[in-house]
Amino acid sequence: PTAMGYLAAETERVIIASGILPIYTRTPSLLAMTAAGLDYLSDGRAMLGLGASGPQVIEGFHGLPYTAPVARTREVIDICRQVWRREKVQYMGDHYQIPLPQDRGTGLGKPLKLINHPVRSDIPIAIASLGPASVAATAELADAWLPAFYTAEAADAVWGDSLRKGNGKRAGDRSPLDIYAGGSVAIGEGMEPLRDRARPGAALYIGGMGARSKNFYNDIFSKSGYEAEAKIIQDLYLAGDKKAAEEAIPDDYLAKSSLIGPEGFVKERLYALRESGVTSLNVSFAGADAAERAAQCENLRNLVDSL
């Protein structure tokens, strides 16, 4: 929140998004208040990013049980939107009860509403989700979807059924789901070696971001056409050979998951992303300094405008 408040004060037009806030670490009302405060500071430019994280982080770092991530996410979204409408919050879900039932506390809780007036009564919510049930819920309820290890070629096979299921239940008055993907950007001849910068992060998530038996990122990578590689990377990483795990990341994946290469190649990747359903780009720019990164941003914008 501190960093987002700073950015809100220093900018005028860009959307200020929270990244991915784990739903277990804050109450739904606090998540709603955080987004409402940011929306006020930014004059209506906030986006609330939410995710369930995973059991190793929630239980190992936060000391909380990792239970019912999809159902909890659904309830959090419902409560946040109730708060933003400045209704007296009353919610009796399976995981959140507001006010707290009298037999579980002092009995003094009563329905309350947000004192401040948000700029908007429906702040956009982006959900980071990967599994079938969570992606379906995202397509049904959220405003935007933040996938990981997205490649245009595998997207429909991995997530298509879930997206169609969720979109079939989506409220008619909510705008179509905004799908974010893209990766690192470096447009020009001879840029291909910059793809290797993604190896450490990819190896960490595929190999070590979760237990061997429950690593969501490894599952997605495997389903994306890299089943053998996913197992090798995980084995190497968990054995402590991180360098070998990084080297085992397929060059083919690094090319498909980024926008790095000659202008023609990047334009082809943009077409592929659009055809797979991507509606917004989630990217980072390569460059030695701010000027180089700004130039890459301008290059990408020109290519997008030319599609």
Predicted feature residues:
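Active-site-adjacent structural elements that line small-molecule/cofactor binding pockets in enzymes
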Residues: 1-307
